[in-house]
Design a protein with these regions (language model features):
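C-terminal binding/interaction regions
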Residues: 2-24, 72-153
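Generic hydrophobic secondary-structure packing signal
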Residues: 10, 29, 57-61
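Short beta-strand scaffold segments in enzyme catalytic cores
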Residues: 27-38, 124
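Hydrophobic "anchor" residues
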Residues: 41-42
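A short, polar/charged loop-to-alpha-helix boundary motif
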Residues: 51-67
Length: 153
């Protein structure tokens, strides 16, 4: 599906959702994630809230979309977009949220994830960047620890 078509469809759906249920934009983390499945169905999930004892947390929209896909016996994702329900801007999902999409089906390494209304990248490039950042961070930690150990008394 063309870039601007999928983005426009999801944005329109998000705007309608907020008009009907304004409370859904409950925080800056309120989002909608839409996944274009292999059969061209659009499966969406909206951020939700969970409670453990008296502590609340947010369930990511991406996770909710994956659960919806699983419930519909679908696993193959072609495109994925996450929008803020506050200002309808494109939100790049966290790597942990991308990994659940990739884990659903080996072919999802080709899923394109929107990074702006007019641009997307393969899911693997976002995960590779995270892996590289993590490796650099780990190397820096090891260097720092080695330096600290060198000066230990």
């Amino acid at each position: 599906m063309a870039l601007n078509v999928f983005y426009s469809m999801v944005r329109e759906a998000a705007e309608q959702l907020i008009r009907r249920e304004p409370k859904l934009a409950f925080s800056a983390n309120a989002r909608i994630c839409a996944i274009l499945a292999k059969n061209y169905d659009i499966i969406s999930g909206v951020s939700s809230i969970y409670m453990i004892n008296q502590t609340a947390g947010i369930i990511p929209a991406e996770y909710m979309a994956v659960v919806a896909m699983n419930n519909a016996d679908m696993t193959r994702a072609l495109q994925m977009i996450t929008l803020s329900l506050v200002d309808f801007s494109v939100v790049v999902p966290n790597p942990s949220e991308l990994m659940i999409v990739q884990a659903m089906d080996p072919a999802n390494t080709k899923c394109n994830v929107y990074i702006s209304p007019s641009d997307y990248v393969p899911i693997t490039s976002l995960l590779e960047n995270e892996t590289q950042t993590e490796e650099i961070s780990n190397e820096a930690d090891q260097t720092t620890n080695a330096s600290v150990n060198d000066f230990s008394v």
